[in-house]
């Protein structure tokens, strides 16, 4: 829906998500001082086996306005499963859509590209180093008179994001796997 764009949920390609963790309440403040009501952790996929996938969809919004979405992902894992990498990408191009013909878009124009990877290296039978990175480039524009600069229109809704993020994590397990030490850094 258009509401997902407001909250930026469309910025995260579904083909890179393994699971979503939701933590409610004050205990989530462990993730930062602003997380007093809760957090949502999106866990990206880890490579398990060699694979590749390409998908493309073309949807016509209202039967006339195109929404193109292309996703690519691949994973490579060594034969001994001590190292692996998962690569993902998405490109999406959606035209603006004016449902009621009043000159104002109900769905804004969208140009988005996402690229990233998650890799691991098992440094021993009881330890693992994980590194991940992603880049999200997204431009959204809605309102009216979309061919004019934003300051020359009656109403403009516009965002332009360049997001780089990543993380480095080290896991150390006890020999009986009952205990784990986890050290991580995210940006």
Predicted regions and their residues:
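A general structural signal for stabilizing positions within well-ordered secondary structure
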Residues: 10-11, 30, 77
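Extracytoplasmic
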Residues: 4, 15-17, 35-39, 51, ...
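Periplasmic-side early beta-strands and strand-to-turn transitions of outer-membrane beta-barrels
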Residues: 41, 49-57, 73-157
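Transmembrane beta-strand segments that form the barrel wall of outer-membrane beta-barrel proteins
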Residues: 51-60, 91-92, 166-168, 183-187
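Residues that define the transmembrane beta-barrel architecture of outer-membrane proteins
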Residues: 34-36, 66-70, 111-113, 160-166
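Short beta-strands and strand-coil junctions in structured, solvent-facing domains, enriched
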Residues: 1, 27-30, 94
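Short acidic/polar hinge/loop motifs at secondary-structure boundaries
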Residues: 1-24
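Face-selective signature of the C-terminal outer-membrane beta-barrel domain
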Residues: 122-138, 155-187
């Amino acid at each position: 829906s258009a509401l997902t764009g407001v909250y930026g949920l469309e910025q995260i390609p579904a083909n890179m998500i393994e699971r979503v963790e939701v933590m409610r309440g004050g205990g989530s403040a462990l993730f930062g001082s602003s997380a007093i009501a809760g957090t949502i952790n999106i866990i990206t996929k880890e490579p398990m086996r060699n694979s590749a996938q390409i998908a493309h969809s073309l949807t016509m919004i209202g039967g006339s306005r195109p929404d193109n979405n292309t996703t690519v992902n691949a994973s490579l894992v060594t034969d001994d499963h001590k190292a692996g990498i998962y690569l993902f990408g998405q490109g999406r191009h959606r035209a603006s859509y004016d449902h009621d013909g009043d000159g104002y878009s109900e769905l804004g124009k969208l140009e988005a590209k996402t690229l990233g990877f998650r890799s691991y290296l098992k440094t021993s039978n009881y330890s693992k180093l994980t590194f991940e990175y992603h880049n999200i480039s997204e431009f959204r524009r809605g309102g009216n008179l979309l061919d004019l600069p934003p300051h020359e229109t009656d109403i403009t809704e516009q965002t332009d994001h360049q997001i780089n993020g990543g993380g480095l994590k080290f896991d150390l397990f006890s020999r009986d796997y009952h205990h784990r030490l986890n050290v991580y850094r995210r940006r």
